[in-house]
Amino acid sequence: MTFSKELREASRPIIDDIYNDGFIQDLLAGKLSNQAVRQYLRADASYLKEFTNIYAMLIPKMSSMEDVKFLVEQIEFMLEGEVEAHEVLADFINEPYEEIVKEKVWPPSGDHYIKHMYFNAFARENAAFTIAAMAPCPYVYAVIGKRAMEDPKLNKESVTSKWFQFYSTEMDELVDVFDQLMDRLTKHCSETEKKEIKENFLQSTIHERHFFNMAYINEKWEYGGNNNE
């Protein structure tokens, strides 16, 4: 078994939890609240901006121009391609996407997730540590998208079904390339290093769960009482 496959299989129970949580289940049914959609889109807009910055930080750590080209292409996709999925949700609540994301949010779960990735980008020379922190994002979306398209509970009459349809295919290439990078970059890693890399991957998968739930519960920073909000 390749190391990348080991990581993906280890994360499956967490992804099952994500799928069965309120955010995805309500989205499947086409009844996710407007508040949850807005919070998700606003937080994800901030998240994707940082995600592209981390891609850029990985470029000097790549040894081949092919890998550099891949990272540049992913930056372009994050800036333009993934907006398509966001606009599906904006259409669902009948609000312009650009108007929704004018209000910036930085909830605790998104903050912790981003800092997890930045720490590995700054502290680890081997890009495998950072990729392990980033790779669960497309993998989680790919698994959820594919599973939803086979789920009889999917409300195909709702525009939200297009969100699942998008992620059921659009993440495949990114997942494959991340797997190839992971296997190549960990080829000479010690077992201790591989254990840390695996923990990075699983921690980010948990961060993905918290991110969806953050939108579902309208998570905010609590500073202690109304006077500090």
Curated annotation (Swiss-Prot):
GO biological process: thiamine biosynthetic process; thiamine diphosphate biosynthetic process
Matches recorded under InterPro entries: Haem_Oase-like_multi-hlx, Thiaminase-2/PQQC, Thiaminase_II, Thiamine_Salvage_TenA
Positions with a binding annotation for substrate: 44, 141, 167
Entry keyword set: Hydrolase, Thiamine biosynthesis
EC number(s) recorded for this UniProt protein: 3.5.99.2
Any one Pfam family match given in the protein's UniProt record, by short name: TENA_THI-4
A molecular function (GO) term: thiaminase activity
Keyword ATP-binding: no
This protein's GO CC annotations: cytosol
Pathway given in the UniProt record: Cofactor biosynthesis; thiamine diphosphate biosynthesis
Catalytic reactions on record: 4-amino-5-aminomethyl-2-methylpyrimidine + H2O = 4-amino-5-hydroxymethyl-2-methylpyrimidine + NH4(+); thiamine + H2O = 5-(2-hydroxyethyl)-4-methylthiazole + 4-amino-5-hydroxymethyl-2-methylpyrimidine + H(+)
Presence of the UniProt keyword Phosphoprotein in the record: no
UniProt xrefs under SUPFAM superfamilies: Heme oxygenase-like (SSF48613)
Active site, per annotation: 137 (nucleophile), 208 (proton donor)
Site-annotated residues for Increases nucleophilicity of active site Cys: 47
Family to which the UniProt record says this protein belongs: Belongs to the TenA family.
Database matches in NCBIfam families: salvage_TenA
Complex formation: Homotetramer.
Protein function: Catalyzes an amino-pyrimidine hydrolysis reaction at the C5' of the pyrimidine moiety of thiamine compounds, a reaction that is part of a thiamine salvage pathway. Thus, catalyzes the conversion of 4-amino-5-aminomethyl-2-methylpyrimidine to 4-amino-5-hydroxymethyl-2-methylpyrimidine (HMP). Is also able to catalyze the hydrolytic cleavage of thiamine; however, this thiaminase activity may not be physiologically relevant. Therefore, is probably involved in the regeneration of the thiamine pyrimidine from thiamine degraded products present in the environment, rather than in thiamine degradation.
PANTHER family hit by this protein: BIFUNCTIONAL TH2 PROTEIN (PTHR43198), SI:CH1073-67J19.1-RELATED (PTHR43198:SF2)
Protein name: Aminopyrimidine aminohydrolase
Source organism: Staphylococcus epidermidis (strain ATCC 12228 / FDA PCI 1200)
